């Protein structure tokens, strides 16, 4: 057994050497991995030339508290190797708290953005609920059947569409039949046209036992659907209870049913929550996420951007020219000779004043007056003269 263990350890070491050699040969600046691969990257990190970032795509409980899933019973390995990464990204402040509390690991929060923008929105008059999910234990489909059975006893109009597939498909379909609600549940299966179902529904349901940062909620908000979800994980960071949906107590199917009935029987409430959901969707615009990730990359690489070096002056300038300098953080600066600075900025309709106002303001500073300043503006033809 000792020989076998020694041989296995030797094989692992050889594989690690192979990966280190390959990754270093690629001359990457930053390597990003997700889920369990983050632990493996942490093992390689000290030998890599690139900066390293691990990225969690589920909540702390979903990774560490579920038997035989991802980091189950691997706390010691996480404590040993995740700190070797340059950054470890989590989805919410709750995850940040739990990693620090239980493992003493520092993390950084980056939320997932919405994946699309839709001009078309749902019809609040529709009497259809929607679920978009995988048929697995974590998604709480058994809890959904229990809640919807009780709902159907008090309502004879609404239907439930469920799109998705998975290992528990047959079990959940059988459960619906056993409860006598099979004529009220439309099991769609996998579809290439989820938009059709979002637009034909007016309320989205998410009875999950655990979630990280569910993309389906942002999809629902983008189409104007309020969301009912059990109060678990980061749900209250996404759903404003009573405004963009409801957060019944975790796994209380009766309270989940009550929330469904409340929305189903009040069209004006659905309209109000639909408007709120659309507004809330703007919080998850991809442009905001890109900005946050760009800042992270600059910090990890030790790049001090134009904005970082001149933040004090820029903030002062914003007070003086509030409409002219809001895009200053997008300016890139290159010192190409001792007394020459090249700036790269973007224009866009009406935005030529942004870098120009900032430029004039910086010239008031003594340390900039001996330099030649060259500005390169993208989309110049789209600007005002």
Question: Where does each model-flagged region fall?
Answer:
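A conserved mid-protein helix/loop that constitutes part of the nucleotide-sugar donor-binding site
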Residues: 127-150, 167-173, 254, 353, ...
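Donor nucleotide-sugar binding/catalytic pocket of nucleotide-sugar-dependent glycosyltransferases
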Residues: 79-118
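Single conserved hydrophobic/aromatic residue that forms the stacking wall/gate
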Residues: 2-5, 9, 13, 181
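Short hydrophobic beta-strand element within catalytic cores of glycosyltransferases
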Residues: 217, 226-229, 239
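Membrane-proximal helix-turn-helix segments that form the acceptor-binding/catalytic region
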Residues: 20-21, 70-88
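Aromatic "clamp/platform" in nucleotide-sugar-dependent glycosyltransferases that forms part
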Residues: 190, 209
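Conserved acidic donor-binding segment of nucleotide-sugar-dependent glycosyltransferases
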Residues: 241-242, 246-253, 262-267
């Amino acid at each position: 057994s000792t020989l076998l263990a020694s041989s296995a350890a030797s094989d692992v070491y050889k594989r690690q050497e192979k990966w280190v050699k390959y990754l270093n040969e690629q001359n990457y600046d930053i390597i990003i991995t997700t889920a369990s691969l983050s632990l493996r990257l942490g093992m390689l990190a000290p030998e890599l030339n690139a900066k390293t970032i691990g990225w969690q795509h589920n909540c702390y409980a979903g990774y560490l508290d579920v038997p035989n899933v991802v980091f189950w019973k691997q706390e010691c390995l996480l404590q040993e190797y995740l700190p070797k990464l340059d950054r470890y990204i989590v989805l919410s402040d709750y995850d940040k708290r739990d990693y620090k509390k239980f493992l003493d690991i520092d993390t950084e929060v980056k939320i997932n953005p919405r994946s699309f923008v839709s001009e078309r929105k749902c019809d609040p008059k529709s009497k259809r609920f929607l679920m978009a999910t995988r048929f697995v234990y974590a998604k709480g489909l058994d809890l959904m059947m229990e809640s919807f059975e009780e709902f159907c006893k008090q309502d004879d109009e609404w239907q439930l569409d469920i799109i998705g597939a998975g290992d528990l498909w047959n079990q959940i379909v059988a459960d619906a039949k056993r409860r006598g609600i099979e004529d009220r549940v439309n099991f769609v299966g996998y579809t290439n046209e989820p938009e059709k179902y979002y637009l034909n529904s007016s309320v989205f349901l998410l009875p999950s036992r655990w979630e990280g940062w569910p993309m389906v909620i942002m999809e629902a908000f983008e189409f104007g659907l309020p969301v009912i979800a059990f109060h678990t994980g980061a749900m209250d960071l996404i759903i404003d209870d009573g405004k963009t949906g409801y957060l019944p107590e975790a796994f209380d199917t009766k309270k989940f049913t009550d929330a469904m009935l409340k929305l189903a029987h009040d069209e004006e409430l659905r309209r109000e929550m639909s408007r709120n959901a659309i507004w809330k969707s703007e919080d998850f615009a991809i442009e905001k996420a890109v900005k946050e990730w760009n800042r992270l990359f600059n910090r990890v690489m030790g790049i001090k951007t134009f904005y970082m070096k001149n933040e004090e002056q820029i903030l002062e300038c914003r007070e003086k020219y509030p409409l002219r300098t809001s895009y200053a953080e997008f300016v890139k600066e290159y010192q190409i000779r001792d007394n020459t600075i090249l700036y790269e900025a973007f224009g866009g309709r009406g935005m030529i004043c942004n870098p120009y106002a900032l430029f004039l303001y910086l010239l008031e500073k003594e340390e900039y007056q001996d330099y030649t300043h060259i500005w390169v503006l993208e989309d110049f033809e789209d600007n005002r003269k």
